[in-house]
Amino acid sequence: MTRYTKLFSALSAKNEGAFVPFIMLGAPTPEASLAIIRTVVAAGADALELGVPFSDPVADGPTIQRSHLRALDNGATVDSSLELIRQIRKEFPELPIGMLIYGNVAFTRGITQFYQEFADAGVDSILLPDVPVREGEPFIAAAKQAGIDPIFIAPAQASEATLEGVAQHSSGYIYAISRDGVTGTERQSSTRGLDKVVANVKRFGGAPILLGFGISTPEHVRDAIAAGASGAITGSALTSIIERHTTGTHPEPAQVTDLEALTEEIFAFVKDMKAATR
């Protein structure tokens, strides 16, 4: 069993959903991102979705775009991200770790090497948000060779062919989006029609469904699970908390103003979001 299959099996036995926070590696600083990750795990996060900073994050809204810049301004690289992942895996050997990384990173490092490096660091899954499933063949092959679960996005208004491809080729979980567009709480998630989104994806079978994009409140999490999803992913709402405790304007390196206050607020937020999965 993989870490994902163990997780979803254990949660199902408890009649719980999964809460998965998204965190940008190296943002606002490497040390702060590690402290944030330790905090979300202590608060009850079931798995992690980690970002590798990239200079042109087209699938992300303004909040997460700024987190890419904060990490880059503090010197984050793919290699430094891999080092952080190795540390996280050492501390949390059973925790599923998923990555959200732009496809250009894979091309730059070489697709086979890219997947093997992240597998060796302890990663369970990789989602390339700018690579649709119809273009996924070389990535799927390299991921499977390295023992990584390839994840694809199931868009809210996807064609049947796309949904069938996502269900067929995603393992670990399926990232279903509650609405089309970019990530972020700048456009709040509408929970109306979530059951139709989930049912549409489920028609083709496949891995458990996690809902994302605009999930920012416990009510959103409850609605996602009530709609039939196995859990929810939250990124921009958590990133906004981090941003409120950060100084510095791009391209100046950012700093955390009060790490204790930041981690306390994050702990409370994640605890409430996880409670909504029960």
Curated annotation (Swiss-Prot):
GO cellular component, one term: cytosol
InterPro entries for this protein: Aldolase_TIM (IPR013785), RibuloseP-bd_barrel (IPR011060), Trp_synthase_alpha_AS (IPR018204), Trp_synthase_suA (IPR002028)
Pathway annotation: Amino-acid biosynthesis; L-tryptophan biosynthesis; L-tryptophan from chorismate: step 5/5
PROSITE patterns (UniProt xref): TRP_SYNTHASE_ALPHA
Gene3D superfamilies in alphabetical order: Aldolase class I (3.20.20.70)
Gene Ontology molecular-function annotations: tryptophan synthase activity
Keyword field: Amino-acid biosynthesis, Aromatic amino acid biosynthesis, Lyase, Tryptophan biosynthesis
Active site: 49, 60
Hydrolase as UniProt keyword: no
Classification via CDD domains: Tryptophan_synthase_alpha
Family, similarity comment: Belongs to the TrpA family.
Known role: The alpha subunit is responsible for the aldol cleavage of indoleglycerol phosphate to indole and glyceraldehyde 3-phosphate.
Name used for this protein in its record: Tryptophan synthase alpha chain
The encoding gene: trpA
